[in-house]
Amino acid sequence: LHDIINLNEFATYANMKVNPGEEKYYPQANGEMRYVYGENLDSYKADPTNPANYRVINYVDWQKEAYSSALSQIYSASVSGGSDAVQYYVSANFKNIKGIVENTGIKQGDLRLNLTANLSKAVKLTLNMNGSLQQNDMMTGGNTTGGVAGSLARTVLDTAPYRTPSDDPSLLDNMDAKTNVDSWKNDYDDIINDKKFNASADLLWKINKHFSYNLRAGGGVSVNDRNRWYGMTLTIGANDEGVLAVSNTDKSNYSIENILNYNVDLTKKIHLDATAGLTYDVHTFLNKNVKGTRFSNFDLRTKGLHLASIIKHDQPTQKDYQLLSYLGRVNLSAYDKYLLTASLRADGSSKFK
């Protein structure tokens, strides 16, 4: 943590910045710090004993209010076994990682399955599947403009080391004056729900001593939902009477590869291997963004989009493509010294392992 000035040091600094007679901070012999609004300065100087003319403020270390030690928990279990014909591996994991900022953290569960099966002496099948569910409750990462309106980290460093009295007139004129660490902790949500699933299969068929066939298929699905809420004690939320930004991103892909391999020794010193294949890839991407403002009720926060008076739907972003590719390659090696290669690629998408 940074070495932050205390309340007395801040009062001395703030009083030095203004003209004589306009000081707002008055430390007392008993350790009390009095804060005087600009319009009450004359009244306070005339009667400094009248509590109506000042407010007592207390020192707040915003770093300690914002950050604290966090506990992380990780649990995992796995099972493996099988026989000569079939082998399997199953694992499960759960993570509960608390953030150093209150009400932030990650919860994630994962499940994985690996299976290998010898269907015959010539055919082998390998399956891999995994999925995960994740909820990430984050704190804002800031923006390029800085200042207390941008992020908690800047608010911690830029805010005066005390809580501004609620009846301070400056709160009416300066929106940023309302924003402190409490605002970010209690009036901001950034929740991401992420779902992922991936699967692949690899079938190898050794047709004879020269030919082998490989079929690979795999794909994945990803669903990402993000909801950000700015309440009335944050500048962004106060400007629009509450702001809820909702983002949904859906991605998926799958691919199929058919590979035929040929290997032969033409002589004791000359070897030939050839590959021919066909691949097909499909990718989809869709992103939707919705923004709600002018809320009539603030209690539902990230779940209250229907309470917004103004709902703006941005133009969705969609990126889909399919690719069909052909490939071929021939390698001729001689005497373990010379190599001649010829290859054919269609669409520039061929891949060799």
Report the location of each language-model feature:
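Surface-exposed loop/interface segments of Gram-negative outer-membrane beta-barrel transport/assembly proteins
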Residues: 1-58, 69, 99-106, 110-198, ...
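Membrane-spanning beta-strand positions in outer-membrane beta-barrel proteins
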Residues: 76, 87-91, 118, 124-128, ...
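Ligand-site clamp/hinge motif
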Residues: 95-97
